């Protein structure tokens, strides 16, 4: 087995498909650094299942895909295929050549193939592990692998030997067994808990099963006794049947008379039906008219309410205007204008005084300056002459230029001051105008707020009215639905599935008058009491005499239609003698209204029955009058020596019919209420829509006013800010001008002084002046003039401020007066418009009230017409129902008379009815046909011995006693009755019996036995798995021990070759535990006493690691080895020694060596040259060294 070829497509730097063909021996791969030699090693490791990106010298696994260059785009996948020659069957697969392919895509997906078939990574690893190539890839010695071997933990070094020895598959088998053991432990604990719990439950359930078994025996005995009693009853009733015959001629005469009466009644019924149809159409039309008028009345009422509220609102809403009188504002404006003129005059006077004070001050300052100059002239005359006239002249020009600059600045500031004052005045005027408009809008806002609140309140009332009517309508509709459902449910209760229903559907014309519930009427509230007294007769059919009843029973029997109760018409009965009812009671006969033909039967059934309130009164009444029967309103019936009642009583047909009638009356009233509420709701919805529109309009007007006021306030803020800014600028500019004027005064004084000095210097002789000037008097006069000038300037400032304060105030007041007049005109116009609107609303309200009055009268008239038509229709329907009942009764009578020709069958039918009831009871309770019952349990059948007697007999026979077999016992009714009671008593003594105990016990016992078997199976399986683990441990121990022994021996030999005279050996860290022990490496090169591997040189470490790998290779050879620059750190001597080992390995394995060393190339059988041009893509060429011939082994 050896590597035949390696194909790379898009793997790392191999952008183009490249195939490297190998042969046995040593193959050297050479090339410059960075050309992609190690990528060949990475490709081999990757295709054989390597999963570590760092092992492949990358950050993530996707880094193996060609990333592209400046001239080549990146690829989307990487693919590597290695082909292995398997002619020696080293791999456990039936192919002489095996190809393994691995692909990776940019999205991280991977694919594996073996000979073109998809497979898993595990399949690849298991295939290679059997040939000594495990997941650790010890056959691939990459860069840094030598250091890793020596620096790894002893346990990691053990993994190299285990992989070479093929221990991995045994460890996988052990791990799999241990995982199964872990899972099995949970199942074993669960099974143990279940069996323990089932064992605990079996004992009490067994006791319950024994009780159930005993109950079955007693129940069988009880069933036998009851069956024999039922068979005796059936035989006795069959002997009671008799036949009665009536005269046929009398029946025929009565039949002809009834037929004539039936024809007359049928014609009358047709006339009633026609008239009722016409009345129904008229009533429906009137009902629709009433509904439309009611809705219109509700809408008119809503319109009246809205118009009344609007008129009241318009009358009460005040029209607000400003509180200021425009004439007063104009008078104030005139007064302010006069004050402004006076202030301007005062300002002119103050300015005139200021000019005089300034002239006086200038004169005094001039005199003072002349005095100073005269005083200083003599002192500085000589100095000034020495300083030179040129410098003084320059200073004079400079100071004059400064004065001119100050004059220009003052002029500009004066212009800016006037502009700022004008802007401030304009902003104040606009502010006052806008402020007046804001006041007007605020006054109008109050009215809009009030109007909006009123419209919202009106809308809320309309919403509440609509919600109230909708809730009432829903309640009424729910009531209608509930009543209809109740009527339907009660009608379902009237649908019978017994003989009564069969007779009604199939035999109604043969003497059957109809159900008793429809033929009789009971006073409201007494239905339950009368139904309790009538019993089954309350649900019975009325038959037209004895013959009709006989015929009906015969038809039932023939058709097997079930059982039915019949009340006989024209039954002879003497009316009871009138007597007062007992105190607190009513006679039952007085509470029922029945047709005359049924009066006899009703009298027979209800005679002597009194109706009382409660059971105590009934018991007391019967105790006082034993001949009477008493019944309570709840249906409890009391007689002499007996009481019947309770709560488990179903409603009779009579009661159900009465309930249907009551529900029908309530349904009609509820439907009328729904119609009234619908009409009212229609009008309320119209009112709600109108008030919704009013509220939305009021809200829109309010929002518009709010927007206008907000805009005005924003404008006020802007104008106020502009006024304040202008005033601040005016004040600031005034201060700047005053400062400049003060500086100008000082500069002018300096200029004057310099000019005087210059003039004195030019004119004054060298001798000083003869006489000084009186300077003190001049200085005092100057100070007085300066004080007067300051006071005059302050007076001008004060006058200017007062004038500015009132400037434009008169114009503002005049504009406010004009605005107030306009507001008053608009208010008057609004007042007149509201008055007109109020008049219109009042007129609408009055007209609406008049229309509402008329509509109410029309609605009332329509209601009366509707009620009259309804009453007439009800009367017509009642009359038609009476005629229909008469027609039905006559039809039944005619049919009954026809069938009554066979009246002799009535007695037999009555007996048959009783027998059928008994047979039905036997069939329902015991599931036996009457014939089988009599044949097996009839009175003629003797009773067999009981199980107890037979058991005693068998025991006596077993004891050898001379006994006779128990003889059958003849039937005896009292004995069977006692037998049945005894069985019932024994069954009651058993208490509560679990009928499913026998089945539950059997099922639980079966489950317990099954789980016990499963538990034993799991224990056995666990024992087998533990045996597998022990077996695998033993196999691992054996394989590892043998491999370690061989590797240890080979390591000593290989170390001696690489280090002649040196000593190296392998040592186990824990020899007592060969399953987990690690492996330490001890190496002592010749002439050195080293105890730690870290003290070895780099070359010595590399040789030591190579020695261990070669020892493993020789002890457990692998088909091929790949080495990546393992000899890079060796000198020539050690390299030759290593090459000698390569030549030894070449004999049994294929070597692929990445190298830069020439000696290594010399021993190679083939050379592969790997290059990389400027495009970053690897290219490969090859050279076969043996035979000095060149073969092309690479396809690119």
UniProtKB/Swiss-Prot annotation:
GO cellular component, one term: chromosome
One Pfam family, short name: SMC_hinge
Coiled-coil features, chain-numbered ranges: 168-288, 327-497, 654-829, 972-1026
CDD domains: ABC_SMC_barmotin
Keyword vocabulary terms for this entry: ATP-binding, Coiled coil, Cytoplasm, DNA-binding, Nucleotide-binding
Cleaved signal peptide residues: none
Alphabetical list of Gene3D superfamilies matching this protein: 1.20.1060.20, 3.30.70.1620, P-loop containing nucleotide triphosphate hydrolases (3.40.50.300)
PANTHER family linked: STRUCTURAL MAINTENANCE OF CHROMOSOMES PROTEIN 3
Protein name: Chromosome partition protein Smc
